[in-house]
Amino acid sequence: MNQHQVMALAAMCQVAKQVQKVAQYGNNNEHDLEILLSSIIQTSPASPEDVYQGTDNLRDGYKTLLAQLSAGAQKDVEIVKYVGGLMQLERALSANDKSLNELGKRIDDIHRRLDHFAITDESVVAGLADIYSTVLSPLGHRIQVYGKPELLKQQLTQNKIRALLLAGIRSAVLWRQMGGKRRHFFFAKRKIIAIAKAKI
């Protein structure tokens, strides 16, 4: 277990936390939204940290990760389900070359639109959400989102959630690229906790 694997885990936890906020309260941290959505277009970063413009931007994610792993801490079942769902969906994606190629093309299209719009612009968020719906959702492994029905019916809420889940897939890809394995949760918990504590 290394720092980059824990960083990717923290990013997935931060995505899960933002999905919760949007689904349950209809709001989100705009800075976190920008950082997480920007990670999607970081397809050739100079370093893993560059995906998130530095690990300082993931402090909430590290805190959330610690809360899930620390002894005696109250676990958030939704966070666990979201992160597990992202990992499962990423595995399905990595096994499908056609979907991977389509994902790359669609992300390139979004990158070009950023010459005119911010990553958090509603039209860009809608574009990212559409990528999730048309490229990732057909792979199965649907991620169930929990929230207020009146919020989940709103198009903007749906778009933000799907765009955030796409960002979560980006972090799940990084987790795998850095050598992350599911067994690390059982055999490297102390190491994960130590690294996360050093980041907050």
Curated annotation (Swiss-Prot):
| Keywords associated with the record | Cell inner membrane, Cell membrane, Cytoplasm, Membrane
Q: How does this protein lie in the membrane?
A: Peripheral membrane protein
Its GO CC terms are: cytoplasm; plasma membrane
Location relative to the cell: Cytoplasm; Cell inner membrane
Cite the Pfam families for this sequence. Answer: DUF489
* Family matches, as PANTHER family: HIGH FREQUENCY LYSOGENIZATION PROTEIN HFLD (PTHR38100:SF1)
Q: Identify the NCBIfam families for this entry.
A: PRK00218.1-2
Q: Which family does it belong to?
A: Belongs to the HflD family.
Q: What is this protein called?
A: High frequency lysogenization protein HflD homolog
Name the source organism. Answer: Pseudoalteromonas translucida (strain TAC 125)
